[in-house]
From Swiss-Prot:
Main location (coarse class): secreted
A GO molecular-function annotation: toxin activity
Location(s), subcellular: Secreted
The protein, known as: Conotoxin Cal6.19
Cystine pairs: C24-C37, C30-C41, C36-C46
Recorded superkingdom: Eukaryota
Domain comment, as recorded: The cysteine framework is VI/VII (C-C-CC-C-C).
Keyword Ribosomal protein attributed: no
Signal sequence interval, chain numbering: 1-22
GO CC term, one of those recorded: extracellular region
Tissue: Expressed by the venom duct.
Amino acid sequence: MKVTCVLVLTLMALTVCQVATAYCINVGMCIYDGYCCSNRCWGGMCSPWR
């Protein structure tokens, strides 16, 4: 997981990075426990593998 939430927050202008659950956004990135990762999305959750 990479701490790129600041970048996402700037682009999305939302507080989605503060959500405790994992959600997929249109950019193809995942948000999990406040952290954004470039892993693939599976069922709206962040996949542990790329």
